[in-house]
Amino acid sequence: MSASPEDFERAAQLRRELEAHDHAYYVLDAPTVPDAEYDRLFRELDALERRHPELLVPDSPTRRVGGAPVPGLVPVRHAVPMLSIRTETDTTSGGVIAFDTRVRNALELGPHAPPVEYLGELKFDGLAISLRYENGMLVRAATRGDGYTGEDVTHSVRTIRQIPLRLPGRPPALIEVRGEIYMRRDAFERLNARQSETGGKVFVNPRNAAAGAVRQLDARIAARRPLSFFAYGFGEIGESGGWNMPATQGEMLDALDALGIPVCEHRVVASGPDGLIAFHDRIAAARDSLPYDIDGVVYKVNRFDLQRRLGFVTREPRWAVAHKYPAQEEITELVDIEIQVGRTGALTPVARLKPVFVGGVTVTNATLHNEEEIQRKGLLIGDQVIVRRAGDVIPQIVAPVVERRNGSERPFVMPQTCPVCGSHAEKQPDEAVTRCSGGLFCPAQRKQALLHFAGRRAMDIEGLGDKLVDQLVDGGIVSTPADLYRLGLVKLANLPRMADKSAANLLAAIEKSRHATLARFIFALGIRNVGEATARELARHFGSLDALMDADIERLQQVADVGPIVAHSIAGFFAEMHNREVIEQLRAAGVHWDEGVPAVAADGPASGKTFVLTGALPTMSRDDAKALIESHGGKVSGSVSKKTDYVVAGAEAGSKLAKAQELGVAILDEDGLRRLLEQPA
């Protein structure tokens, strides 16, 4: 039965009431009804919408609970870049004066000109986000990403009750609100207590808990975490209609507040640097009592017309600066130095500290990065050391307090073998990191080795992802890549959330992977510094795996693009007998390959096209990206022109990206490049 006019009217009334209660509770911190009454209204609306689906609208409060997981995070290009703000390195009042001097010089203001008006705000320790409203409706939320391209996280952001799904009044037809998603300290403590009770992951700090929730594919995770939001600016704005466009940063925050969007009350309009210094000192004194984490304050030229005159330098506005506080320090004992083996085989010294309260948390461990850092800082086990929470997040040891030594201290000695698997530990001449050489054998590296081996660009075992690898390794079913080829249907099907069909599909993918190319197999081994392009050159040069395994460093360096560093990596990998044993197990399991190099694609989406690479790609080196394009028939050029077909842009892309935008050249990120190359010929 369809909904009656009374049903439509009641649903609209319930939505208005719930939205008003949400705003009072989550934004104003002034609840207007008891929880039981709110729950009753919510259940009534939910029941109405379930009974009559035609009543459901995108901005209904019932949509905040989170729906089915999305298949993936889609890239979003920011119409107005979300650029970072320069950090003033001088944490004293001198940093404020330096900023004011730069602004006055850029505006060509003489010594007798009136002081510049600024707005002082807090610098939140959270996740930057952009909220896009069209005709008053929230249509998209995106992360900052690299400033130019972020990720669509609308599904998660909808669950944050502080963020309105619909703006009241008559806002511009299009408005992007920029701000920060964060988690209050008390909410973070409750979350971690709940996680600990249920055996879940305990988070290091509120920022990690907030950012991790927003970027989940399943919005229900964000809905279960107590996330908050503060707005601090605009992005793209369309026709204003009857809305009064703000002329200053302060007016903008007031306008956002009038739209029901949360803004922080701790802000000040200051004339000249003196008011900013007073604001900096006042917030520093109140910092520990704030209900959320901050790592500094932000100063902005208040007038928008002056902001436009000042403009930008590279990726930063001239009209704003972040002024961080000095990291907090304490002294404690360096009880011991232990070695952790990471997923990539890095042996990392970790300081075990006598518990000390610093920067708002109790610190018991600190990373020492590598042996050279320990020597550079002159640390001895048993030292009294200065511990700092750098950036208020990562604990680090600054230095020993030498005058407190009593003679019982002892030096740290880096182990010569991996403490996990016993393989030889080695350090390249130009590297500071010591690494385990048992890449295919070491338990600490198992999961990473299996994921790399099964990757699409390696042995291409479809269906073998992170969660399944966790189950296989944690359950003791798989230890090395060779064990994959011993899996049976019954053992796989008995795993949690693994149906017979999924198990059969995985076994089929494993079976298919038995036949590869030599280049793919070499890449799949996960030899450090050996990417796809180098693997192809090695396969082309040696023609067989045995010849490669027996090659010495001198012969390895005869291969194109293989220098001393790569040659030592390859030789060290094959010198470890554990790795050779796994390779022989793979051969015995029927893994084989064509001793040749794949032909360059003669026809396809990249064939005959000219590409230009700029910036740092997330997972590929520039050489790997170049080789991948060329293997599909494309050509890579060093400069952008009208003849350029595509520009592949990563983080920190520079003038080439700007030139491409000017010429209207198609721009791809790494995922876009892969999708293009995967298109059928």
UniProtKB/Swiss-Prot annotation:
BP GO annotations: DNA repair; DNA replication
Binding site for NAD(+): 35-39, 84-85, 121, 144, 180, 300, 324
Pfam families assigned: BRCT, DNA_ligase_aden, DNA_ligase_OB, DNA_ligase_ZBD, HHH_2, HHH_5, Nlig-Ia
Positions contributing to Zn(2+) binding: 418, 421, 436, 442
Domain named BRCT: residues: 601-681
Cofactor(s) demanded: Mg(2+); Mn(2+)
Keyword Metal-binding: yes
Coiled-coil regions listed in the entry: none
Top-rank lineage group of the source organism: Bacteria
Residues the record marks as active site: 123 (n6-amp-lysine intermediate)
Keyword Protein biosynthesis: no
EC number of this enzyme: 6.5.1.2
A GO molecular-function descriptor: metal ion binding
Catalysis performed (reactions): NAD(+) + (deoxyribonucleotide)n-3'-hydroxyl + 5'-phospho-(deoxyribonucleotide)m = (deoxyribonucleotide)n+m + AMP + beta-nicotinamide D-nucleotide
Keywords for the protein's UniProt record, in alphabetical order: DNA damage, DNA repair, DNA replication, Ligase, Magnesium, Manganese, Metal-binding, NAD, Zinc
InterPro entries: BRCT_dom (IPR001357), BRCT_dom_sf (IPR036420), DisA/LigA_HHH (IPR041663), DNA_ligase (IPR001679), DNA_ligase_AS (IPR018239), DNA_ligase_CS (IPR033136), DNAligase_adenylation (IPR013839), DNAligase_N (IPR013840)
Described purpose of this protein according to its UniProt entry: DNA ligase that catalyzes the formation of phosphodiester linkages between 5'-phosphoryl and 3'-hydroxyl groups in double-stranded DNA using NAD as a coenzyme and as the energy source for the reaction. It is essential for DNA replication and repair of damaged DNA.
Family note: Belongs to the NAD-dependent DNA ligase family. LigA subfamily.
Matching PANTHER family: CHROMOSOME TRANSMISSION FIDELITY FACTOR 18, REPLICATION FACTOR C SUBUNIT 1
Name of this chain's protein: DNA ligase
Organism of derivation: Aromatoleum aromaticum (strain DSM 19018 / LMG 30748 / EbN1)
